[in-house]
């Protein structure tokens, strides 16, 4: 069953993918905030249907948000290689806290937009990832727990 959420009317297109960054303090008094915030922070979603319903919003440009149906997607992270890294394992993700800001993988190693101690199931282990700091890193496909 799809989840219902709200997204800026300029972004409300079927097939668009996004990561829910979490609630904003500005939204605490909004009458429809529960619809916006019924998604999990840091999880990846795809819009599957755009409904015609528009709601006011002080955050998005145009001051309007569309009601949309979304599905949660699998995601990937880049994690340090270890003997415990196995398909099917449930692991607690920890940020690398890397300071190499020009690295193209920094968001997936540092777990931006994620809650601390995120639990995931490793669906598949992908290729090696070149780390400019010399760590042995792997790309892994995950599902959220």
UniProtKB/Swiss-Prot annotation:
Matching Pfam families, A to Z? UPF0179
Source domain of life: Archaea
InterPro entries tied to this protein: UPF0179 (IPR005369)
Q: List the disulfide bonds.
A: none
- Report the sequence similarity comment from the record: Belongs to the UPF0179 family.
According to UniProt, the name of this protein is UPF0179 protein TV1250
Upper classification of the source organism reads: Archaea, Methanobacteriati, Thermoplasmatota, Thermoplasmata, Thermoplasmatales
